């Protein structure tokens, strides 16, 4: 099941980014008063009472300065919050009376029909703070908090989680591969999905997704079962086309959460953009299998070196995703689209690969012998043994004499050796380093 989405909204300088950091468990978001900064740290995952969720910081919303381009952009971010959120946290400044912007935001949120929690921030004295003025916003009882000091955040999270949709697991055959097609607007997601489904004559059914607005297409190919999670299919009637690219990120997050393999679409005419990096980064952190799909290849003037140059550029821009295979296609003409499902099968298998402990440790000893760890102040790292503890993604624990001696370069060396020996193409690898005395913890 995809994680619920919690959007933090409010006018500028009420403490949204500070609250965002609190709810994200201290993960770094840039906190400044300069417009646009928080857009670089738009989303993070968090957990409370066993429920995982995604937090979105929408930036400051202003209605009073309605003629400025910045204000218009912030209002579009309000639309993003309304469209995407399961729960909205409306942050206000408890130290001043409600402003006209607060009133306008409250009106917008009331019309949304979504659960809205009013978070009265910057409360210094919980016993003496009067919040009766904020009842006029029509959003119920304010929850007093101090994001800076972390006070009453637990009560706020209790309220947030109480509004989440029921946590119901999907009933899907374990052998079915769930494919998420993600990417920026107009990169060709719908065309690719239509081409894939158009070529596969045995469409089994349309399955309502666990998100409230997704329709998943189930089909068979050569006796194998697939479900396409189509983010492009999440478009609603209205003004969705006008929303900013943050909306596409948020839609993609939901698809990524529910997938086994991700088809990350890139536009051959534009290369890798900052928005592409955000989506790819989330896919990498989620531990899913991934294929980089360069679409609109038919529109590119080419020579015999064009493909190699383009792939090199991708590797430079997405340096953290060197393991992902790349396929150049045209969803419009069908060029190489038939190869996609074979690649999906391969990547799904790689992401589920298990390595026997005895085999792994024999190789680890060889790797350490070939390239001994460097010393640090006279002390040398000793890799005692290793074991695989999970798949999707493949996850390994390395027990060592002192985890602080594991330099990132040696960690990278071990990961490269794992890939050289066992493949894991299209799959991230998780490495956990523990001291021997941590084994029993």
From Swiss-Prot:
State any GO BP term from the record.
ribosome biogenesis
Q: Which domain of life is it from?
A: Bacteria
Q: Where are the transmembrane segments?
A: none
> What InterPro entries does its record include?
AAA+_ATPase, G_ENGA, GTP-bd, GTPase_Der, KH_dom-like, KH_dom-like_a/b, P-loop_NTPase, Small_GTP-bd
Positions with a binding annotation for GTP 2? 183-190, 230-234, 295-298
The question of whether ATP-binding is a record keyword is answered with: no
Pfam families from the xrefs?
A: KH_dom-like (PF14714), MMR_HSR1 (PF01926)
Which residue range or ranges hold the KH-like domain? 353-437
Q: Where is the EngA-type G domain?
A: 4-168, 177-352
Q: How does it assemble?
A: Associates with the 50S ribosomal subunit.
Describe its function: GTPase that plays an essential role in the late steps of ribosome biogenesis.
Q: Which family does it belong to?
A: Belongs to the TRAFAC class TrmE-Era-EngA-EngB-Septin-like GTPase superfamily. EngA (Der) GTPase family.
**Entries under HAMAP family matching the protein:** GTPase_Der
User: What name does this protein carry?
Assistant: GTPase Der
